């Protein structure tokens, strides 16, 4: 019974950590990251399709992303989808591919991204605390139903807190790592 509670807490906490890492990919660092385009979809024969499923997306160099569609007629669609996504760059269609040129980031942009990273980390911590609350409620219910003793409940609460602390530390480390990556020129 308790192991199920702990396993559920671990699984949900891992998902929160993965969501945070995915959120971090949307933040622009000193070098381009093709994952900044992951959320962009294009109209492909009437269906909204992720950009990376209709084109080859490559980082040509530290400041350029090249998008080569598998079908030429998609060039205009890709260009307008990127423009609509408002990622801070204008797409450049050369007839073969769409190129995105990212200017060097200013100090202010870097600091703004650090703020966003910290906010993302805080959101993940709130999620971890909510998971802790659910786990503690499940332990409390077992104790109330006399399925476990008071001593077992105390140990379970300690284990739940230990797992919470572990994931909170992982989040803090992730935010600190992302912060140093963002501030590196």
From Swiss-Prot:
Keyword Phosphoprotein appears in the UniProt entry: no
Localisation: Cytoplasm
Keywords for this protein: Cytoplasm, Protein biosynthesis
Coiled coil region boundaries: none
Example GO biological process: cytoplasmic translational termination
Highest taxon, organism lineage: Bacteria
GO molecular function, a single term: ribosomal large subunit binding
UniProt keyword Cytoplasm, yes or no: yes
GO cellular component: cytosol
Family affiliation: Belongs to the RRF family.
Alphabetized HAMAP family for the sequence: RRF (MF_00040)
Role of this protein: Responsible for the release of ribosomes from messenger RNA at the termination of protein biosynthesis. May increase the efficiency of translation by recycling ribosomes from one round of translation to another.
Protein known as: Ribosome-recycling factor
Phylogenetic classification of the source organism: Bacteria, Pseudomonadati, Campylobacterota, Epsilonproteobacteria, Campylobacterales
Gene assigned in the entry: frr
């Amino acid at each position: 019974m308790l192991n199920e509670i702990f396993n559920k807490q671990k699984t949900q906490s891992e998902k929160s950590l993965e969501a945070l890492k995915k959120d971090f990919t949307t933040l622009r660092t000193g070098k381009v990251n093709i994952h900044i385009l992951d959320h962009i979809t294009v109209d492909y024969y009437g269906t909204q399709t992720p950009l990376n499923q209709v084109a080859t997306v490559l980082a040509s160099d530290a400041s350029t992303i090249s998008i080569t569609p598998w079908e030429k007629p998609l060039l205009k669609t890709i260009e307008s989808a990127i423009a609509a996504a408002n990622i801070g760059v204008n797409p450049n269609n050369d007839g073969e591919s769409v190129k995105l040129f990212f200017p060097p980031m200013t100090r202010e942009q870097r600091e703004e991204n650090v703020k966003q990273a910290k906010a993302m980390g805080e959101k993940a911590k709130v999620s971890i605390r909510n998971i802790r609350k659910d786990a503690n409620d499940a332990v409390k219910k077992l104790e109330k139903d006399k399925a476990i003793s008071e001593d077992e409940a105390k140990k379970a609460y300690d284990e739940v807190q230990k797992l919470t602390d572990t994931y909170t530390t992982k989040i803090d480390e992730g935010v600190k790592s992302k912060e140093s990556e963002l501030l590196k020129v």
